Regions:
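A glycine-rich helix N-cap at a beta->alpha junction
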Residues: 74-89
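Conserved phosphate-binding/catalytic loop of the ribokinase/pfkB sugar-kinase fold
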Residues: 87, 97-134, 139
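Conserved beta-alpha-beta core of the PfkB/ribokinase-like small-molecule kinase fold
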Residues: 134-207, 227-229
Length: 310
């Protein structure tokens, strides 16, 4: 029996405006379209895992508002176990997303109920968490709760994959209990102290991966958009895994699709570079579709995509 993936993280409603380009600071532009989608990095990754047919549970919170029930139901429909998703007083989390015609985006997240994920919630769901084959987490819930989760994972020998988004510095204690850390380019710049405009090349990624490994994580995956992914694994592997060339429509959930695909493939027995290849396919499919959770591919779609590349 496969041990489930358990995602501890955010559940949001995404409010998405599309325009010819992402507005610059102080700029007001006319948009072309507006949609709402279920989102939140935690929920996105849980849905990504569920769509790939792997057992997955979500630990998180929604508000007692008009969004909460719909957010929970969206998870359930994707095959996610939602017994550990709690409704609390106040608003659900929301994300305000602007998307340009090139697929690039900027995002403002208002935590809402996600801000009420507390350290005691880790203890409350300890039985579920102990059953996990891997724990997936992000930075859209309080940092102190993530530190508690990290200690729990380390104590029980459960691999912890951390997606360090939204970008910020991380405490040493948390870094030392991470099994996989998966920053994108902007997060890599912050974690490695690079200039905000410095391009993240394969050489830069290799240097940053070594810096991150020295701080405690056992493995590093640096997500570099169209360039691909730089992998620095505990088994000594250091390599670029190229991305698949596709026309991007919406890159909002590309990183979430990647993390979901990587976790599923790794727990299915693949080696890290093989799992990164599979995850890159999942991410490539996701950017060709609008919306966060709606963009997550099924296992059949990923298999067909990979077959078409041969």
């Amino acid at each position: 029996m496969r041990k489930p993936i358990v995602v501890v993280g955010s559940i949001n409603l995404d409010l998405v405006a599309t325009a010819d380009h992402v507005p610059l600071p102080g700029e007001t532009i006319t948009g072309r379209d507006f949609n709402t989608f279920n989102g939140g990095k935690g929920a996105n990754q849980a849905v990504g895992v569920g769509r790939l047919g792997y057992p997955v549970s979500m630990v998180g919170k929604v508000g007692e508002d008009s969004f909460g029930a719909a957010l929970k139901n969206g998870l359930r429909k994707a095959g996610v176990d939602v017994k550990a998703v709690q409704a609390v007083k106040g608003s659900s989390g929301v994300a305000l997303i602007n998307i340009g015609s090139d697929g690039q985006n900027n995002i403002v997240v208002v935590p809402g109920a996600n801000g009420k994920m507390l350290p005691k919630d880790i203890a409350r769901h300890a039985v579920l968490l102990r059953k996990a084959g891997m724990l997936l987490a992000q930075l859209e819930i309080p940092l102190i709760t993530l530190e508690t989760l990290g200690v729990f994972a380390h104590r029980h020998g459960i691999p912890l994959m951390l997606d360090p988004a939204p970008a910020r510095e991380l405490p040493a204690g948390l870094m030392q209990v991470i099994t996989w850390i998966t920053p994108n380019e902007s997060e890599t710049r912050i974690l490695c102290g690079l200039d905000t405009q410095e391009p993240v090349t394969p050489a830069t990624a290799a240097r940053c991966a070594d810096l991150l490994l020295a701080r405690g994580p056992k493995n590093v995956l640096i997500k570099m958009g169209a360039q691909g992914v730089f992998l620095a694994a505990a088994d000594g592997v250091r390599q670029m895994v190229p991305a698949f060339p596709v026309k991007a429509v919406d890159s909002t959930a590309a990183g979430d699709a990647f993390n979901a695909g990587f976790a599923v493939s790794l727990l299915s027995g693949k080696k890290p570079h093989e799992a990164a290849h599979y995850a890159s396919a999942a991410a490539a499919i996701s950017v060709t579709r609008k919306g966060a959770q709606p963009s997550m591919p099924s296992a059949r779609e990923v298999a067909a995509f990979l077959k078409a590349q041969k």
